[in-house]
Regions:
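Cysteine-nucleophile protease catalytic domains, especially the papain-like/related folds used
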Residues: 1-85
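Generic detector of bulky aromatic hydrophobic side chains
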Residues: 32, 36, 43-46, 60, ...
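Short, Φ-rich (hydrophobic/aromatic) sequence segments
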Residues: 36-57, 96-103, 159-174
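Generic detector of intrinsically disordered, low-complexity, polar/charged segments
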Residues: 44, 52, 66, 125, ...
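Active-site-adjacent substructure of cysteine-protease-like catalytic cores
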Residues: 68, 72-138
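Cys-His-centered catalytic/binding microenvironment captured across papain-like cysteine peptidases
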Residues: 102, 116-120, 129-193
Length: 193
């Protein structure tokens, strides 16, 4: 049967408790039912907070809704901004990205790649910079392909059928200033994302 179903979820973020002690760094090996539930609850809350829409093979969201969700549901700074690379020089873009990383802020990053004439986008996290000027990229995908990469290429190897890699070097954008609002910096860890 084909078709589509949509339903909304309600999450009380003020009282949502995260079981950080049972969230593993890596789920590719064995894990307990409690560890599976802990990470599932976190992913569920993040998706709900940012108004993600899920399909059979992907999830999508509107960037304005994502930013609203980060700020209003997850108490991320009202200074958070969604920026498109095309509006900045390379030097300006690199300086903004480096400023975030020097401040200890992870950066939500978006890139697209072309495959058979179709553009496909992906969002991931940049959370480090090495001495050669390459950025540490967490592409998702259970750690598959995570690496230090050139920001102008952002290639992830072996993630598509047949082991093909992709380069997220088109339509780049990022969310900057992702840090807790001041009133939540000392909030109990179990209630923070």
């Amino acid at each position: 049967q084909s078709g589509a179903n949509k339903y909304a979820v309600d999450v009380d973020f003020e009282n949502y408790i995260f079981d950080w002690d049972n969230i593993k760094e890596d789920y590719r090996d064995e894990y307990t039912e409690q560890q599976a539930k802990a990470v599932a609850d976190l992913v569920y809350a993040c998706g709900a907070a940012m108004y993600a829409q899920y399909g059979s093979a992907t999830s999508i969201n509107n960037y304005a809704k994502m930013l609203y969700g980060l700020q209003h549901n997850l108490h991320i700074s009202k200074n958070a901004r969604y920026l498109r690379r095309q509006h900045y020089s390379t030097a300006e873009w690199i300086e903004m990205l480096n400023t975030q990383l020097r401040a200890g802020h992870p950066v939500f990053y978006r890139g697209t790649w072309l495959f058979d004439g179709t553009e496909a986008g992906h969002m991931f996290v940049i959370d480090g910079l090495d001495s050669e000027g390459k950025y540490h990229v967490n592409f998702g995908h259970s750690g598959s392909g995570d690496k230090f990469a050139d920001i102008n290429v952002l290639n992830q190897s072996g993630t598509k059928p047949g082991g093909r890699g992709v380069c997220y070097n088109a339509t780049q954008a990022m969310v900057i200033n992702c840090y807790p609002t001041p009133e939540y910096t000392d909030y109990p860890l179990q209630r923070c994302i």
